[in-house]
UniProtKB/Swiss-Prot annotation:
ATP binds at Q87, G105, E106, G107, K108, T109, D517. This is Protein translocase subunit SecA. Belongs to the SecA family. The keyword Cell inner membrane applies. Its cofactor is Zn(2+). May bind 1 zinc ion per subunit. It holds the Pfam family SecA_PP_bind. GO terms for biological process: intracellular protein transmembrane transport; protein import; protein targeting; protein transport by the Sec complex. It is an enzyme of class 7 (translocase). One of its GO terms (cellular component) is cytosol. It catalyses: ATP + H2O + cellular proteinSide 1 = ADP + phosphate + cellular proteinSide 2.
Length: 924
């Protein structure tokens, strides 16, 4: 109560922050008359002047007022659009590395031009991030007119570009790109072998459009570049056949936690089936040797019980394609990990693709924290303000609308069953269509959108096909409807463009990230491009365009008279933000509008998260068939349920981040070291240090500090030196010398190893030797890093069990991850040293550049592995072929230098009985 009173007197923190920007807005407005008198050339020259002032010591903050005023004047001249005062405030929030919450239709795309221009003056590159290729291309082409007028270059990063095109786009002053492309380019860059092959510049400033969608909804989804493992498609298909034979009592499903577990009876039944199929390696399903089978069974069970076709995924062209739960869009190229996607493919009887090994990965949380400065825009961020502040250190500022919102938001109507709810929805749609009020119906899945479409067809309405140009003409007849979901995404722009005409009925899955406003009366630009595509420029086209604009103006008045856009929600989403995004489609720029949600006790949110108290109250009221209950108390109860879900999801994201930060810190170290190695022309010093460290560690292992020669393991050291360094040295004779000590032995071995490598350098030439050293070092680092990622992934899956032993799983994970990282660096030194001591180059022509990385990495979107083994770069150079095989009779078991080339699956020549790859071959 006191807090509310204080806010009335002093205003909220948000109000005070907005007021703080007003003096700058007034200063920008004062400059407007002066800038209007400048010629186009004089206005353009201000960019050169600003850059000169930056070079002389001024800051970007010093230039904010004149730079913003310059952009506003340029937009007026080039596009006929003038930034409103509230848009100037939005631009300042973005420049201050905050999140500007702006309602739908308030011109976020135009707002971005202000901070983008200002920050691009620094010459370090500004990234504008969108959720899909269509929006990246549209916004870039649209706003490039302003940037180009002011002398800045604009680049676009979309799927399908080669590295040269990407490099050129990133070199521009302003680069528009999708979050996926940016993340994948970063990962690919850190798999390249030369600095010149990388495409991105250092991360300076980014503005993220639909920031809640990217940094909240997709935060837990890592970007992964992976390569296929062995094909096990038959095994997935076999396991899948067992799942339908289980009954409901054989497993328990927890929809809240999205988990499923077999009961005792289920385990016994599964063991019996696996034994009969001769797949079980021992009596019990949970014996250690059956761990892999248990994993496959669990994933198959998840695929059948937790994932629904046309809700979580669709089947298209012999593929299982994931559907984004927040946007309703298909995500081709994205695959569930850990065998779940293969289990879904087996369930749907499509071709089972090979499993993948992770080569590189990063979450959006960690990728966007690479930027020096970050800003974001969205229509709905206030509900997640705490998370933005906590994880990204970004403040959310609600920007006032240019005109007051006139939309009416009704309380929810709750019915007992889905059937009754859909009856009421169809009735309301027909009423709106009859009075020519456009309706947008939001659904949560493809399945629900098609169910409603079928109900409308039964009521006598027909579905529009926007592949027919006639669908664009004039007002809707009130007897047709359009469906916008992942199946019809090719028609998306057309459907949204016509969703605001009088009498239009549009059924859509979640509207997040659609990017296109629903304009009452229709979208003039879309109609002109479609209807006048074949009409050349000239008086006739100008007259036709004017006629279309007049028609749309008349249609807008008709839609306004009918009450504006009516947004009808068919159920509540888990997140209040997604519901607000749907509501926000109505009432843009001060237009009237209406919104209402229809619910039933059978909805997922009500069924899984709704309180028993709510359900009990509704039943006690004794609702009759077709009756609804409407009360603000129900809205509050549902909001509490949504807040619970949001809090749970936030905790999950926070927990994921804590674990991912461990990997992220290690990733930074590896990528920074890798970049330094790539930048170095000569890595000889690094290689020498590694060799000396390896020798020091070897000697310390067999000759303890301050020990006597009789305590030394001379034979062990002799074998280790032959094994790792391929050197046959008189270590036993050295040990017999009077007064000999460990450090002296170390120095002698180092001297011999250095002489051996110096002779190789003299034999093959320093330039070629430097190339070989760099190649082996980078390839070995990449190979070990991939193994390390896999080990951390396995560790993360089981570390939670430590909690049962009263130990903190996170601290245990940090400790063991550090030990694994240290061990990886030790192995790197040892393997690089061993490989370089062994390398023999058959012929020595002049070295050429390393082959391009594109021949060796996986395509981010297709999932096809193009990354060769760790020796790819060497094998691509025939002149670097290693020595040929040596006959077995000529190999000395105690001297690896006599073995020559040994097949990885051959018995090791040392006589251990192991395969070469598991013995000495681990260095090869």
């Amino acid at each position: 109560m006191l807090g509310g009173l204080a806010r009335k007197i002093f205003g909220s923190a948000n109000d005070r922050r907005v007021r703080g920007y007003r003096p700058s807005v007034e200063a920008i407005n004062k400059l407007e008359p002066e800038l209007e008198t400048l010629t186009d050339e004089q206005l353009r020259e201000r960019t050169v002047m600003f850059r000169q002032q930056l070079a002389e010591g001024k800051t970007l903050d010093d230039l904010l007022v004149p730079a913003f005023a310059t952009v506003r004047e340029a937009a007026k001249r080039v596009m006929g659009m003038r930034h409103f005062d509230v848009q100037l405030i939005g631009g300042m929030v973005l420049h201050d590395a905050g999140i500007a919450e702006m309602r739908t239709g308030e011109g976020k795309t135009l707002v971005a031009t202000l901070p983008v221009y200002l920050n691009a003056l620094a010459g370090k590159g500004v990234h504008v991030v969108t959720v899909n290729d269509y929006l990246a291309r549209r916004d870039a082409e649209w706003m490039a007119k302003v940037y180009g007028f002011l002398g800045l270059t604009t680049g676009i990063i979309v799927h399908g570009l080669d590295d040269d095109q990407r490099r050129a786009a990133y070199a521009c002053d302003v680069t528009y790109a999708t979050n996926n492309e940016l993340g994948f380019d970063y990962l690919r860059d850190n798999m390249k072998y030369e600095r010149a092959q990388m495409v991105q510049r250092p991360h300076y400033f980014a503005i993220v459009d639909e920031v809640d969608s990217i940094l909240i909804d997709e935060a837990r989804t890592p970007l992964i570049i992976s390569g296929p493992l062995d094909d096990r498609s038959d095994f997935y298909n076999t396991i899948d056949k067992f799942i339908p034979r289980l009954s409901k009592g054989d497993y328990e499903v927890d929809e809240k936690q999205r988990s499923v577990a077999m009961t005792e009876a289920g385990m016994e039944k599964m063991e019996q089936m696996l034994t009969e199929a001769e797949l079980l390696k021992s009596g019990s399903l949970y014996d250690i040797e059956n761990v892999s089978i248990v994993h496959h069974v669990n994933q198959a069970l998840r695929a059948h019980s937790l994932f629904q076709r046309d809700k979580d995924y669709i089947v298209r062209n012999d593929e299982v394609v994931i559907i984004d739960e927040f946007t309703g869009r298909m995500m081709p190229g994205r695959r569930y990990s850990e065998g779940l996607h293969q289990a879904l493919e087996a369930k749907e009887r499509v071709t089972v693709q090979p499993e993948n090994q992770t080569l590189a990965s990063i979450t959006f949380q960690n990728y966007f924290r690479l930027y020096e400065r970050l800003g974001g825009m969205t229509g709905t961020a206030a509900t997640e303000a705490a998370e933005f502040a906590d994880i990204y250190k970004l403040d959310v500022v609600e920007i006032p609308t240019n005109r007051k919102v006139q939309r009416i938001d009704d309380d929810d109507e709750v019915y007992r069953t889905n059937r009754e709810k859909f009856d009421a929805i169809v009735k309301l749609i027909q009423e709106c269509a009859a009075r020519k009020q456009p309706v947008l119906v939001g659904t949560t899945s493809i399945e629900k959108s098609e169910l409603l479409a079928e109900r409308l067809k039964q009521a006598g309405m027909r579905q529009k096909d926007f592949s027919d140009r006639a669908a664009f003409t004039g007002s809707s007849d009130g007897k047709s409807f359009a469906v916008l979901n992942a199946r019809y995404h090719e028609q998306e722009a057309f459907i949204v463009a016509q969703a605001g005409v009088p009498g239009a009925v549009t059924i859509a899955t979640n509207m997040a990230g659609r990017g296109t406003d629903i304009q009452l009366g229709g979208n003039a630009e879309m109609r002109i491009s479609e209807e006048l595509a074949d009409l050349p420029a000239g008086p006739e086209r100008e007259a036709a365009e004017a006629k279309i604009r007049e028609e749309i103006a008349a249609l807008k008045q008709e839609a306004l008279a009918a009450g504006g856009l009516f947004v009808l929600g068919t159920e509540r989403h888990e997140s209040r933000r997604i519901d607000n995004q749907l509501r926000g489609r109505s009432g843009r720029q001060g237009d009237p509008g209406h919104s209402k949600f229809f619910l039933s006790l059978e909805d997922d949110l009500m069924r899984i998260f709704g309180s028993d108290r709510l359900e009990g109250m509704l039943k006690r009221l004794g609702l009759q068939e077709g009756e609804a209950i409407i009360h603000p108390w129900i809205n509050r109860a549902l909001e509490k349920a949504q807040q619970k879900v949001e809090a749970r999801n936030y905790d999950m994201r926070k927990n994921v981040l804590k674990y991912d930060d461990v990997l992220n810190d290690q990733r930074k170290v590896v990528f920074e070291q890798r970049l330094e190695l790539m930048n170095d022309e000569d890595v000889a010093e690094t290689v020498v240090d590694m060799r000396h460290d390896v020798i020091t560690d070897l000697v310390a292992k067999y000759i303890p500090v301050n020990s006597y020669p009789e305590q030394w393991d001379v034979k062990g050291l002799d074998f280790a030196v032959r094994d790792v360094l391929t050197l046959a040295l008189p270590i036993e004779d050295w040990a017999k010398e009077e007064g000999i000590a460990g450090p002296e032995v170390t120095e002698r071995i180092i001297q011999k190893a250095d002489e051996w490598m110096a002779s190789k350098s003299a034999q093959y030439g320093p330039e070629l030797m430097r190339y070989v050293e760099k190649s082996i070092l980078l390839q070995t680092l990449d190979h070990l890093w991939r193994e390390h990622i896999a080990m951390l992934d396995h560790l993360r899956q089981v570390i939670g069990l430590r909690g049962y032993g009263q130990r903190d799983p996170l601290q245990e994970y940090k400790s063991e991850a550090f030990q694994l990282f240290s061990a990886m660096l030790g192995r790197l030194r040892e393997i690089v040293t061993a490989q370089l001591m062994r390398v023999e180059i058959v012929s020595t022509p002049q070295p050429t550049e390393l082959p391009p990385m594109e021949a060796h990495h996986i395509d981010a979107s297709t999932g096809e592995d193009e990354l060769a083994s760790a020796g790819a770069a060497l094998s691509a150079r025939p002149e670097l072929a290693l020595a040929t095989e040596v006959p077995a009779a000529d190999r000395d078991p105690n001297d690896p230098s006599t073995w020559g080339k040994v097949g990885r699956n051959e018995p090791c020549p040392c006589g251990s009985g192991k395969k070469f790859k598991h013995c000495h071959g681990r260095f090869a």
